[in-house]
Regions:
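Active-site phosphate-binding strand-loop segment of PLP-dependent enzymes
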Residues: 91-189, 197, 369
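Conserved PLP-anchoring active-site segment centered on the Schiff-base-forming lysine
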Residues: 50-105, 330
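PLP-dependent aminotransferase class I/II
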Residues: 12, 34, 38, 68, ...
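Short, solvent-exposed loop/turn segments at secondary-structure junctions
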Residues: 45-46, 68-70, 91, 116-118, ...
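A generic structural signal for well-ordered alpha-helical segments
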Residues: 76, 130, 154, 294-295, ...
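Conserved PLP-binding active-site segment in aminotransferase class I/II-type PLP enzymes
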Residues: 1-57, 79, 278, 386-392, ...
Length: 401
């Protein structure tokens, strides 16, 4: 079932001219890569290359938070390093004592996350700890479009940083690997994007932007797909190396076939011409309005009740007191709520981390993206009120999974 038929509105932003500028302004957010950064298809690919840039080997361990999407763990395993999980508290802060316990003789790096676009609560302590224990710091900014902490922009505190722009923009793919320290040598030989791939992306975007014309351009779509398949089959690299990642892909596995895929031309163009300030302003405004309304609902607890200046939220994360897997109830009612219960890393079974288990089972995320209008926010609040009312008489901690 398509997203438009299942939900009352989209989980992710769709393409619109409203947030485009005619020319790419100088100095805007994330408009160009540099000698110390690379534009890639996926953030998980950036994590893989980050390990190589930092000189890790297959004998090294990477400390990883126990609350994380499996897509961020798979590249560590694929690289050959060993992920070692550390505890996360219910407010998404790091269990610093558990980190200390997990630093063994093979520990080489520590990965931390700026959850949902908000500065990590322990960033200074983690930086100091890594400096003290001679660990490399990997800053996962996959939920970040912009923001700072103590005057330092997010993405500049780790030895490397990883961004995922397709979480914020209506693009096919798009991620960045940023190096903040000198390395002996770093070269990523990305494949050139075939014209047929660019054409296919353009057709997909047109179908997304104007669904009624899908039937009219179906012949063009079929031609684009045929040419792309033919190009892949004729390539010396083989079809597996011509694989693509499309916007909205929920796969968490690490696919070597797309490892050397660049950020697409169309994605780069949209990103360069997007009015980032307008996107940030709309997302912040939606967050403020939604948070104000949710404050009035008994039993609803937001992970971040306040939105700091300069932060661009990815989503609005929250829990229902005493009720697990609420996102499933909301999705049944047409609200595209999301949770990480289905993307928990395979190693995290058996109640090893109780607070992380709570987050996987109880924390869910509401969209606040730039395409949402006031009536969409009102719809979310109305459904949440109804769900809260209908579950108020149920036993506490009821499991809906």
């Amino acid at each position: 079932m398509s997203q438009s038929r299942q939900f009352k509105f989209g989980k992710d932003p769709s393409f619109t001219f409203k947030f485009l500028r005619r020319s790419a302004p100088n100095g805007s957010l994330h408009t160009s890569a540099s000698a110390s950064s690379w534009w890639l298809a996926l953030a998980r690919n950036a994590i893989y290359f980050a390990l190589g840039a930092l000189g890790l080997t297959s004998e090294d361990e990477v400390l990883v938070p126990a609350y994380i999407c499996a897509a961020a763990v798979e590249p560590i395993r694929a690289y050959g390093a060993k992920p070692v999980f550390y505890g996360i508290n219910k407010d998404c802060s790091a269990d610093l004592l558990d980190i200390e316990r997990k630093i063994g003789p093979c520990a080489r790096a520590l990965l931390f996350v700026h959850y949902f676009g908000f500065p990590n609560r322990n960033i200074r302590e983690l930086r100091s700890l890594c400096d003290l224990r001679n660990l490399l710091l990997i800053e996962d900014c996959a939920h970040v479009l912009c923001g700072e902490t103590d005057g330092v922009p997010l993405g500049q505190l780790g030895d490397v940083a990883v961004f995922s722009f397709r979480k914020f923009l209506p693009i096919i793919n798009g991620a960045e690997l940023r190096l903040n320290r000198q390395v002996e040598s770093m070269s990523i030989k990305l494949r050139r994007e075939a014209f047929t791939s660019t054409l296919k992306h353009a057709v997909n975007l047109a179908e997304q932007r104007w669904p009624p014309i899908s039937s009219a351009i179906k012949p063009l779509s079929n031609v684009a797909k045929f040419l792309h398949r033919a190009s892949s089959q004729q390539s010396q690299e083989g079809p597996a190396q011509q694989a693509e990642v499309l916007h909205g892909n929920s796969e968490t596995r690490f696919d070597p076939g797309v490892l050397y895929s660049p950020m697409s031309r169309l994605s780069r163009w949209i990103m360069a011409h997007t009015d980032m300030e307008a996107v940030v302003e709309r997302r912040r405004d939606n967050y403020f309005k939604l948070a104000d309304a949710l404050h009035e609902i008994s039993g609803v607890e937001m992970l971040f009740p306040k939105l700091p200046a300069g932060v661009c939220p990815w989503t609005l994360p929250l829990t229902f007191e005493g009720l697990s897997y609420v996102h499933k109830l909301l999705r049944e009612r047409g609200i595209p709520a999301v949770a990480w219960d289905a993307v928990r890393p395979q190693e995290l079974g058996g109640a090893q981390f109780h607070d992380a288990d709570f987050l996987y089972e109880n924390l869910f995320f509401l969209p606040v993206h730039q395409n949402l209008e006031p009536h969409h926010l009102d719809e979310m609040v109305s459904v949440i009120k109804n769900v809260r009312h209908s579950t108020r008489s149920r036993p506490l901690a009821r499991n809906l999974g």
